[in-house]
């Protein structure tokens, strides 16, 4: 299945889901404020999340030994909830 992401513009929620494998998921932003998942390698369906229109980022690692990180090197991100799921996970907030 790999990592998938969807954005609900009406609620401002960006949801990211891993699978049963060992996933590395990194949320970040570019200088213009676009929110990126794995540096833009994961396409976001449903809209274009930015720091201006996103109220919450939810990341669900699910099974496997996941590494989930919020990288704020390019500026602050919206609030985020990180859920590792089953496995030995590493969660790092911004």
Predicted regions and their residues:
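Acidic, glycine-rich low-complexity segments
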Residues: 1-94
């Amino acid at each position: 299945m790999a990592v998938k992401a969807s954005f609900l513009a009406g609620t401002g929620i960006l949801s990211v889901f891993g699978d049963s494998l060992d996933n590395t998921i990194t949320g970040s932003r570019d200088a213009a404020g676009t929110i990126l998942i794995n540096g833009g390698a994961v396409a976001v369906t449903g809209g274009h999340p930015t720091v201006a229109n996103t109220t919450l980022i939810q990341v669900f690692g699910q099974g496997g030994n996941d590494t989930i990180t919020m990288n704020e090197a390019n500026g602050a991100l919206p609030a985020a909830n990180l859920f590792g799921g089953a496995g030995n996970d590493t969660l790092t907030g911004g």
